[in-house]
Regions:
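Beta-strand-rich domains and repeat architectures in extracellular enzymes and scaffolds
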Residues: 11-42
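Conserved strand-to-loop turn within each blade of WD40 beta-propeller repeats
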Residues: 38-41, 78-82, 120-123, 167-170, ...
């Protein structure tokens, strides 16, 4: 019986401190896509789908906790411990806007047309900035009093044209109508939310809280059901295969491994290579690989199907995807 091929990761170097967040763009018109990484070194990095470095966004004065790309890949937004959120031109690397906050910005999200920016962090307040009127005061989303959450906001995502979803240390996931600025739904968990990411192709939110992974319909009235799993460890981050939806990957703060699970929770693989806890994982939009970011300061790219010619594995494929 032949031994299954093991995934040999590609290591994307360049950062000097722990990786805090990873985010891929959607697949672009030329079939490529981009990867952006956040790091405590304060310098978000942009990479091609192969992992090759394109450039570094220079300007933050503190750790960067979140960086996300616009749908067309032309803009990036970042949130930092320097109390700012910034918007960048991904072609030139120039900072287009810098928005001051009163505390650490933990998460950012751009609207589908990259006309607005959603931010959240340790102020426990959700702000909406109009990028066409960058000097205008932001609008706020408040639940009770002058706060959006009762704890640090760990993640914000923009769903469709008019929905914002936020998650925090208070264990709550909240849906907001961004036209009326009203709260429309809340789900409460017993543990703080450690991560929440939007899987754009599947239109699901992947949420980690305690030892639980939740796959939640991004829009509450879509007719899809929530799929809930309890693992034997507490994941720091999780990401679902964007096409097959038959598996998900996780990182954990309790060890240095990346794990692959079937959608029913069965552990399929344990991938070793990092030299520190794994803070974040993310599937590429074509499902052919997933990226992991660690306390060790490296990004590792893992093949979904080891042995397949893809990207820089076994030479560059002629058609890429």
């Amino acid at each position: 019986m032949s031994t299954p091929l093991r995934s040999t990761p590609l290591v994307a170097p360049g950062h000097t401190r722990p990786i805090t967040h990873l985010s891929f763009s959607p697949i672009q018109d030329d079939s490529s896509f981009l990867l952006v990484s956040s790091c405590k070194d304060g310098n978000p990095m942009l990479r091609e789908w192969t992992g090759d470095w394109i450039g570094t966004f220079l300007g933050h004065k503190g750790a960067v906790w979140s960086t996300k790309l616009s749908l067309d890949g032309s803009r990036a937004a970042s949130g930092s411990a320097d109390f700012t959120a910034k918007v960048w031109d991904t072609y030139s690397g120039n900072c287009l806007h810098s928005f001051p906050h009163n505390h650490i910005v933990r998460s950012v999200a751009l609207s589908p047309q990259a006309t607005h920016l959603l931010t959240g962090g340790q102020e426990k307040k959700i702000r909406i900035f109009d990028l066409n009127r960058p000097d205008a005061e932001p609008e706020y989303l408040f639940d009770s009093g002058l706060l959006s959450h009762d704890g640090t906001i760990k993640s914000v995502v923009w769903v469709g044209d008019h929905t914002g979803v936020t998650a925090g240390d208070d264990g709550k996931v909240k849906w907001w109508d961004l036209r009326s600025r009203e709260l429309t739904k809340t789900i409460a968990y017993s543990d703080p939310i450690t991560s929440m990411e939007l899987s754009l192709p599947t239109q699901r939110l992947v949420v980690t809280s305690g030892k639980n992974v939740e796959f939640i319909p991004a829009l509450p009235h879509s007719g899809h059901n929530t799929h809930s799993l309890t693992l034997r460890y507490a994941p720091s981050s999780a990401s679902i295969h964007p096409i097959l939806q038959d598996r998900f990957v996780t990182g954990s703060m309790s060890d240095e491994w990346v794990r692959v699970h079937s959608i029913n929770g069965e552990e399929r693989d344990v991938l070793k290579g990092h030299h520190g806890p794994v803070h974040c994982v993310e599937f590429s939009p074509d499902g052919e690989m997933y990226a992991s970011g660690s306390e060790d300061g490296t990004i590792r790219l893992w093949q979904t199907t080891p042995g397949k010619t893809y990207g820089l594995w076994q030479g560059t494929s002629t058609n890429g995807h």
